[in-house]
Regions:
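Short acidic/polar hinge/loop motifs at secondary-structure boundaries
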Residues: 234-235, 242, 247-273
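N-terminal periplasmic accessory domains that precede
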Residues: 147-148, 201, 223-225, 245, ...
């Protein structure tokens, strides 16, 4: 039995133990009873969060000085019996039972509730309890009258240290303060994103604890991972465990969701299972992007221009136009272009001992030298968005946005680590990388707000088209190979209906229903070069086929569908003034189908596997259009039989054949739930405890195979606190997640010579790990140290491993080289991965930033330093680290860190200047200032310094100018 379960030695750093101890100490402050007894009177209260804006129209000054009250009246106790009810009617009951008149504000009384008030109390004691936490105060005018008024704000000292700003989010489906929301959530507005120099979602990887986001070469997709769990399958029907929503609309494909960040209102990243409200495929978390909506009362806009190295050019802007008092428009757009981070070479000769000039194994075919802008890692993308807001009445509003995104970059490249270590960021490519992706999205939200409830409808529709070429062998193989998305089309639509009651009710409920449909079609091809390496007349690479678009292997998926239906509800009940209980549940019905999907091979090799010269097969393999050229061919494809459509001489009578028939339809059902208790002993401190379950849809794949859904049960406790007079914010969460049928992908085995022995690696397949356990601690700190100094810290300490995970040996008895051929391995001899760590899960990772404002008469100069540090992590499920000498001829001395990224530190620097009383700002930004080489994903080709890998961007810098304007 093969084993690959090596683990790094040592436990978590001391910082983890100290942080956990601090966490437990804080949590121990919770009293065992949440009732206050005063003179034998038990007061059970409920707390309500009321935004300050709701009381602006009320008086903010106290009435005339009160008349003296008789001592007898002041000490007189009254037997009060006031049930829980709105504050307005509660004060009426108080007035009747105390025989006293109430004078003052009434506008906001309905927005608060009183809890049960029983027992013998003085009038003052009763009023203290009734008005606690409402922002209201009172003054006794005389024995028979009392005045209720809004507390006057305390004037701020001119030189007082600034306070942390309140952050309003909608993580619970309602607008709440971040610090009063019992969820592990991080939130950022556009100002914070600009301050960090963020241009796309990947920047959040160092701003959110436990979040990893990186691009990958195939499929132009982004790998999103939260709390140690992500998706390595990026095909046309794959699902990830981190859902992405834009303006409340679910985005099923990461290629369509991870676009440019511009004109953003806020981003909320929710950690842990969020399936109750966020729906399918949010078993480890949810990322929610909310763009700016039109304003109805002001003409305003912004513009920014940035220039940097690698000929970086970045433009962003937005314009808000109120057409009338009830209708407004907003237009925003962004572009980003830069040259390639990676150089293209003719061949690897002369670059070192691993690449000798005489090596047939590592010498590539000659290639066309003029690639223009098609070199790896260049960027050419733009996006625009037109949105409207119609608000004819105070009760109804309609928000609509139309967005288009296009990416014409060149994709990524997998680089040889030994070359990167020498400062050579270069690759040999037999085919220039190519990408053309467009995504068009329509989003609509309708809201109707009645007196006691709000009804919302959300509709989304999108279409994504993509063509792409990826060099599969990086020029390292004499059997040139490229992966080509000949065509693809992804159509998605969704409907969601939500009904919720008023925010001021003691029992707050939310009901909803969701339905979505996705239809995808794709033609994916694998091309190979002529065995002799001939070129066409124009110098371009010569293919086996003379037909444009022809290939040696196709995955033709004309109709892959996903349908999802969900019903959900969430209830929150205020137990008393200090604590509340939340329960939620969601029913999900997911259906996936493949109609007419076929994997087709066209013979370009002999039965023994040697390559056939181009002259022996005539015109060569057919193009996808040729394959479907006539009814007989279509009938053969549908039947899954061998066929010859007459476009090739072939070898024998069968130039092309169907390798796999993919027809399948399967449905999964799930009920996921949420139980949460939160306790707030003061306005500055909250604790919460949560038990939640999550569900990630099952997966269908080629040959009619499928894997089970992924489920998780998560246990979590957390706290949110503000100290130092609201100048220091500290939030933390401790979690333990048990996963069943955790989904991971690896390469399948193929039998290409029909001898019954699997002899080469093949397409990526998804498999279920029986079980996995992930636990960790997350901390976020935001500290206004002085009036000119500010610091932020995010930290994640994670321990993750597979409890039970065995897979077929797709590596042919060798854990370090997936492409070793001609070795027979029994299916009963699996690779045991139990105890291994999932990819890209460091034991700890933190980001520390510090900024200082130098204040001058003419403006403010702000330097900022950001330190990012991470422990080491593996890049694949095999946890491949050290290779002993003598195993492979190509690596006689062995190797180390084959599939590992060592621990590292990164440094980002910025300097910005904002003039006083002006609407412009200029800033300089440097990312990865020390130019560190950081692996984010791995491939399969082997070098002495490790497997080929995708790397983080090198050092980049830019100068950026921003301007804000409005009609005032």
């Amino acid at each position: 039995m093969n084993k690959s379960n090596k683990k790094r030695e040592g436990g978590l750093p001391t910082a983890v133990v100290l942080a956990a101890a601090s966490f437990a100490l804080n949590f121990g402050l919770i009293p065992q009873a949440i009732a206050a007894t005063i003179g034998g009177t038990v007061i059970e209260d409920t707390i309500e969060d009321t935004p300050e804006s709701t009381i602006e129209s009320t008086p903010k000054t106290s009435p005339k000085k009160a008349t003296k009250i008789s001592p007898q009246s002041a000490q007189l106790t009254i037997a009060f019996n006031i049930p829980s009810q709105p504050l307005e009617s509660g004060l009426v009951a108080f007035s009747q039972q105390a025989d006293i008149n109430i004078i003052g504000v009434t506008a906001i009384l309905r927005e608060h509730r009183v809890a049960v008030l029983k027992g013998d109390l003085t009038k003052a004691e009763a009023l203290d309890r009734l008005l606690q936490g409402t922002g209201l105060s009172y003054e006794m005018i005389n024995d028979t009258a009392v005045s209720i008024f809004v507390k006057a704000p305390v004037p701020e000292a001119p030189d007082e240290v600034p306070l942390l700003q309140e952050i309003i989010i909608t993580a619970t489906g309602r607008a709440t303060d971040l610090q009063k929301t019992p969820i592990a959530v991080s939130a950022f507005d556009q100002t914070r994103l600009d301050f960090a120099g963020a241009t796309d979602l990947r920047a959040l990887s160092y701003m959110v604890p436990g979040l990893e986001m990186t691009n990958t070469a195939p499929q132009a997709a982004t790998l999103v991972q939260l709390r140690g769990v992500g998706s390595t399958n990026i095909t046309e029907i794959a699902d990830g465990p981190v859902s992405i929503h834009v303006d409340g609309i679910y985005s099923p494909r990461s290629q369509a969701a991870v676009t440019l960040l511009y004109d953003v209102d806020r981003i909320e990243v929710l950690r842990g299972p969020q399936g109750t409200l966020r729906g399918r495929n949010s078993s480890s978390g949810s990322i929610n992007i909310y763009n700016q909506q039109p304003l109805l009362d002001v003409v305003e806009g912004n513009l920014s221009v940035g220039y940097g190295n690698y000929d970086r050019r970045e433009y962003r802007g937005a314009l808000n136009l109120p057409v009338s008092d009830t209708f407004g428009l907003r237009f925003a757009g962004a572009t980003l272009r830069h040259d390639a981070y990676t150089d293209l070479l003719d061949n690897y000769q002369g670059l070192g001992p691993d690449y000798p000039a005489t090596s047939d194994e590592l010498t590539a075919f000659d290639q066309a030298l003029d690639y223009g802008q098609s070199a790896p890692e260049m960027a050419d993308k733009y996006s625009w968005r037109l949105s409207s807001l119609w608000q004819p009445t105070e009760q109804f509003s309609a928000f609509t946005s139309l967005e288009r995104y296009r990416d014409q970059g060149a994709g990524l490249a997998q680089l040889a680590p030994d070359l990167v270590a020498k400062g050579i960021r270069a690759v040999v490519s037999d085919s220039p990388s190519f990408l053309d992706l467009t995504n068009t999205v329509l989003r609509t939200k309708l809201d109707y707000r009645a007196t006691d409830f709000t009804l919302s409808y959300l509709y989304g529709k999108s279409q994504m088209d993509r063509q792409q070429i990826v060099d599969a062998d990086n020029g390292r193989s004499s059997s040139f190979e490229q992966q080509r998305t000949h065509s693809s089309n992804f159509k998605f639509s969704s409907h969601e209906l939500q009904l919720m009651n008023d925010d001021t009710e003691r029992l707050r409920w939310l009901l909803g229903g969701f339905f979505s449909r996705e239809k995808n079609e794709i033609v994916f091809a694998v091309d190979q070069q002529n065995a002799g390496g001939e070129r066409n007349a124009d110098g371009a690479t010569s293919w086996i086929s003379d037909f444009e678009g022809a290939a040696v292997s196709y995955a033709i998926q004309p109709d892959r569908r996903v349908e999802s239906m969900g019903l959900f509800s969430q209830l929150t009940y205020d137990l008393d003034r200090f604590s509340r209980f939340t329960v939620g549940a969601r029913y999900t019905n997911d259906s996936k189908s493949d109609r007419g999907g076929r994997a087709i091979n066209c013979r370009v090799t002999s039965v023994l596997g040697s390559y056939v010269g181009p002259d022996s097969i005539g015109p060569g393999a057919p193009s996808p259009e040729d394959i479907y050229a006539d009814a007989a061919t279509q009938q053969a494809i549908n039947a899954g039989s061998f066929h010859d459509n007459g476009t090739s001489e072939g070898i024998g009578d069968q130039p092309c054949w169907i390798r796999q028939v993919n027809d399948l339809k399967i449905t999964w059902e799930n009920v996921s739930g949420l139980l949460r208790y939160d306790y707030r002993p003061s306005d500055d401190l909250m604790y919460f405890a949560t038990v939640s379950t999550g569900f990630k849809s099952g997966h269908i794949q080629d040959a009619g195979n499928h894997v089970a859904p992924e489920t998780v049960t998560n246990f979590e406790v957390g706290f949110k606190a503000q100290y130092l007079d609201d100048r220091l914010r500290l939030n933390g969460a401790l979690f333990h997640a048990n996963y069943n049928d955790l989904q991971f992908s690896n390469e399948d085995r193929l039998d290409i010579n029909f001898d019954g022995i699997a002899d080469t690696g093949g397409s990526t397949v998804v498999r279920n790990a029986s079980a996995a356990t992930i636990q960790g601690l997350e901390l976020e700190l935001d500290w206004v140290m002085t009036d000119v100094d500010q610091m932020q810290l995010t930290a994640a300490f994670t321990h993750a491993h597979f409890d039970q995970f065995e897979i077929p040996d797709t590596l042919f008895g060798d854990l370090f080289n997936p492409y070793v051929s001609n070795q027979s391995v029994s299916p009963e001899d699996p690779v045991v991965l139990s105890g291994n760590s999932p990819p890209r899960v460091p034991d700890w990772k933190l980001t520390l930033s510090y900024s200082h404002n130098f204040i001058f008469d003419r403006g403010v100069l702000t330097p900022r330093v950001v330190l990012k540090a991470s422990d080491s992590y593996y890049l694949d499920i095999y946890n491949r680290d050290t290779l002993a000498p003598g195993i492979f001829d190509s690596l006689p001395n062995g190797g180390s860190d084959l599939g590992v990224q060592k621990s590292y530190q990164l440094l980002d620097l910025s300097l910005s200047y904002k003039p006083a009383a002006k609407n412009w700002m200029v800033g300089a930004y440097i990312h990865n200032a020390a130019n560190k080489d950081i692996k984010v994903d791995s491939g399969n080709a082997l070098s002495s310094a490790g497997l080929v890998a995708t790397y983080m961007e090198p050092r980049t810098y830019q100068l950026k100018f921003s301007y804000l304007f409005d009609e005032n």
